[in-house]
């Protein structure tokens, strides 16, 4: 089905004029800066952070574009991936009228952002195998459905979604399809970023929080068409990515081997932890994982969670979520952390 971004944008967004910051109007790096009402004497800390950062994060985009083989014009940075999720909903969904479609069990912020923006939520559960029911998804789409969110690898289940099924949805849906790839570095696939040119209605989300180990800095990436990126840039806060985060991201992108080594260690620990968990009486079922966590079904997820907390081992109780009855989600830790988890579970 043909996609037209203009047809799904809210009228006020089409006509909106972005805030023009001082760094937008003068892009040079040298000079006497008397334009942004900054403190000319420096900072109250040793690190000099008295000047506003690049509002478009050009250096970081250039570095990431080389790594991903994607033009910088197709990259948007957000304050975590939650920011582009919220911006996409605000750009396309009229409060009290439009809807998004989610596929539970899935990442909770899609629903939270929709609720905050007074946007209806259509839920189409995954199959019992945590797979996409494409026919049910497309049948549930309404005239005013603007976005479908697909998390792959999925949180909290850990599995990759079928590429062919995602493509069917992309081809059939006239709105935006968001493919959330926060955990893609732990999966044996390149994901959907290489397919950007084929699907103008696709937005691919990735993050520096997981494989890159930079969760505290809050940096998420949206890969999309130049037109969608332009809309996101128009409505984002002017300096949404701070200087320290930009500098840290540049350093990380210059040391990709460090990230790769951490991913290797996590995958090795994931495989070992799965094998050891499967031997325990508390474990009724382990689900396949393409992420840095494992979903384990037990007889009583809340009791298992509480027991672990008593021993200062913190997991996530997912037992109240649809299709995840009895489940706890376990992040893959270091070897020592994983051994401690197993020791506690052996005494449950």
Swiss-Prot record:
Organism: Cytophaga hutchinsonii (strain ATCC 33406 / DSM 1761 / CIP 103989 / NBRC 15051 / NCIMB 9469 / D465)
One Pfam family it belongs to: Aminotran_1_2
Keyword vocabulary terms for this entry: Amino-acid biosynthesis, Aminotransferase, Histidine biosynthesis, Pyridoxal phosphate, Transferase
Name the record gives this protein: Histidinol-phosphate aminotransferase
E.C. no: 2.6.1.9
A GO biological process held by the record: L-histidine biosynthetic process
Subunit structure comment from the entry: Homodimer.
Family: Belongs to the class-II pyridoxal-phosphate-dependent aminotransferase family. Histidinol-phosphate aminotransferase subfamily.
